[in-house]
């Protein structure tokens, strides 16, 4: 067969029953009307396309596809063709057989993050319908296995858009590098009502029981978020009672709980009225609404099930604690008992006290719901219901029941606090770059100003850890940096728990309040102090809410490594699906930075989020990282000892290569190539990603084999760790986290595992760095700060001490044999967001172009494929062809022809062919009906059968 026929028809003119024998057909009478010349992407959720939800972009990035009629990996054919080409012949008892590189093929498929969850329909003729905005493409089921959608956000010439390599944009969102950063803050809990019942004139004055005193306030004054009452409260000049209050955000959910409670009370506490699944669902909703930190969603299924069992247990009238709770009289009420039982069930599920920072929505929601009725939950449980935490949950937390915790961490991106409202917030200052020499290097100096507190390594605790390390090697689960720091400890400070009302209802603030805490090892000083809301909440995250607060794009905040002291927010906002919407003001801000034109080749205020924002951010990160590692090189700088330089800095001869980078794995490989292999060429993106995958997934001799073959000079340096001779031999340790921790589609097995890194302090130390505990993600931040420190030439040449030799052996064993990444990625969420980003970007630029791609196999005289592309008229046919072919990274040589069909809103048909393919558009008459057909011809070539693609996909 040399011809392939594609009918182009309208059901108004000819029924599909007459055309269903054709493998492919295009129906033009079903379309979605354009609005102002653009595709109405708002209609995607109600159309049979792919599953993109009608949510905000922040919610959509965490959305798990609901309707899934099957998934398609757009580049699967590209991958299998490469695997087919690379098969090796082997001899077996059955003769010559061909073996596929299964490891590579599995990686290439798993590495893809553009999976499409399809929403397609099957008609009565067993055809699979793929809906486009201007038509419907019908394919016989036998031919549908390789069809995929291709969405392209059109480029706005005013912004000088360049929408190639949108994979980089997806990578940056995964690694929390396409975000704004804003300081953490605290306010009085919205579920509390604080009522004054006595006042004093000074902190030295004590409150007299039963003799209330009033100076500026009056009895019953409610403490708000501003004004005199707040000032008196925050100054600890007033005693308050803590009552529950229902925040507006969760009023509906609390009403549902109270309805269940009323039925339960009316039915004389019948457990049958308590449906644990329903209760848990409502509490989870409350927990999600009252989230104060923004991070990836938790899979709470197992814990939720345990919580439901505990709810059933506690509402059983035969349960001993149920009996005790109902045996208490006095101020106890049935309304309170309902929430007391919920709180006890949550505590038993957690096996300890539940705080607002609990990561599980159902438990966090249980606490918040109980607060609305009981005020401070654990104080009320002890005081009113005579219930305390079980001894096995820890004596320390039992002591906290005497206190009331009235402050709650708030996320300033989300908070509805009004202008003028008072807050407590963190100020975070990073040490500026400094001038030094190659002889001096850049060491960590633990110094503080006279009025500053200092957070550094506690020498005694460090020595204890060192002894354990020498005895038993590196203990990644128990070695913690926070365990060896002095107080105030920046890794354990939690103002929400450190500030409280004591048993006399006096506000107690921590000793570190309103004082600068300096920590040179984190290159920062921090201070928690009083603040004020300066701007109202906006949808745009680029909005500095606090007076004297801070907000930074990630390109300017690589040194902000202490994650608990700030919040992050994606730089996209508003609806995922929109015809046209405003983009964040952050991109205009970036365009004003001095190095923006050099890193993007763009000028002016109109900036594309990708070609301006994403490219600038990635390149700035790359320059910063390479600049740190270049100075950390173990090589000596003979004759340059007194040469001066500024560190850290982002200048260097490697900037040209950075401008060519397309992927974070290229950056990882380039650092090793440039510094150790003296190679300035970039590796191909696919090669770099596979190298990093192998290093992260293999262990032992297999990992070493990859390093030996890929980075031979680096490998020799790595072997030196087993026999350290000079201090400079330790430098290689701090290169290893770059290879093991950084990727855009991995998950750590446990983000609180600690890896060994060298801290070039007054004395060189091997310290534990938790892989994801400070910044919560799979990128550079957990370790980047420690790469800035490097010894000078004088220090490098020193003979290594015995303890340094221990460092080398321990680090070599750990990094050779440990898998840090390759944990469980939430695949349905992580891998399906490429098209979400494309469609959202289209609303910020010039709209969307859509198409589907169909693959036609050719069997003779050579095996190859022809791509049939059916799309709209937003792109020229030859332009669309070039774009789609460019995505076949591995198997482009097998594409021998292209048919590009465009259908306009008015059903106008255009066809473009190239390669071995020729075409002709004809009229076809069947009985009294008429349609157009595209005759696709390949002179001298023969099409393959339907199952040729099946065989290829099972190579």
Curated annotation (Swiss-Prot):
Compartments, record wording: Virion
Any single GO CC term annotated in Swiss-Prot or TrEMBL for this entry: viral inner capsid
Organism encoding this protein: Bluetongue virus 17 (isolate USA) (BTV 17)
A Pfam family assignment: Orbi_VP2
Keyword annotations of the record: Capsid protein, Clathrin-mediated endocytosis of virus by host, Host-virus interaction, Inner capsid protein, Viral attachment to host cell, Viral penetration into host cytoplasm, Virion, Virus endocytosis by host, Virus entry into host cell
GO molecular function: structural molecule activity
Chief localization: virion
Family the UniProt entry places it in: Belongs to the orbivirus VP2 family.
GO biological process, one term: virion attachment to host cell
Name the UniProt record assigns to this protein: Outer capsid protein VP2
Function: The VP2 protein is one of the two proteins (with VP5) which constitute the virus particle outer capsid. It is the major target of the host immunogenic response. Responsible for viral attachment to target host cell, probably by binding to sialic acid. This attachment induces virion internalization predominantly through clathrin-dependent endocytosis.
InterPro entries: Capsid_VP2_Orbivir (IPR001742)
